[in-house]
Amino acid sequence: MKRVVLILMAVIASAPFAFSQPAKPAAAEKPAMRTWAMHERYAKANSELTKSPKAVFFGDSITDGWAKRDPDFFTSNNFVGRGISGQTTSQMLVRLQADVIALKPKYMVLLAGINDIAQNNGQIELENVMQNIVSMVELVKLHKIKPVLCLIFPTTKIKWRMALGDPTDKIIRLNEMISSYAKAHKIQCVEYFADIDKSSGNLPESLSGDSIHPNLDGYKIMESEILKVLK
């Protein structure tokens, strides 16, 4: 009997320790790697190209959406889109080598800057934004690629950064920097909606729901304008 009691006491004493042991966690799935400049976004597409494109359209969500909304425009003209939604000029500069220069196009069509004004990666002076644009232009020119600079669309609000207020003045200033630089260096500069009434400070709703991202009709106007340049 004494032996039974001792065994029971030993079992009871060890119970808290046994139940306190944490269950072995299941192996966690490794999250997909995402670099700051998102080099991985077009790595596969770049490796699968069988010939150099006539033009690389380089930019942010506007360019990203263009290739998705009207892919036939790109394939039929031997163009490729290398836009990434939300990107600033700093990020574009970092991936320029992989997504533009390495593809050896005849042209780089650059539309960028609105996300810098929106402070997507923090506050940045317009002069520094312009320096990024100039750096991209100078780098592609070293590789015999012709740059084409595009002006930012007018808008009185940035819906994902409403607290910043009306960005009109900054857009005008940056566009003036871009156009002045282009003129001084004999670079093609495109204002896609030059002939559209923008007296409201925005693109018409028939072309863009937020005056930043064009709809298909807006992209069709852009296509007719850029084809005048990419000869």
Task: Give residue spans per PLM region.
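N-terminal secretory targeting modules
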Residues: 1-56, 68, 103, 180-185, ...
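Conserved beta-strand elements of the Class I
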Residues: 56-58, 80
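Short hydrophobic segments within beta-strands
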Residues: 58-59, 150
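Active-site metal-binding loops of divalent metal-dependent hydrolases
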Residues: 61, 84, 114
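Short, solvent-exposed loop/turn elements at domain surfaces
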Residues: 63-69, 88-91
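Alpha-helical cap/lid subdomain in secreted, periplasmic
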Residues: 72-78, 94-231
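A short beta-strand-loop structural module common to alpha/beta enzyme folds
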Residues: 78-91
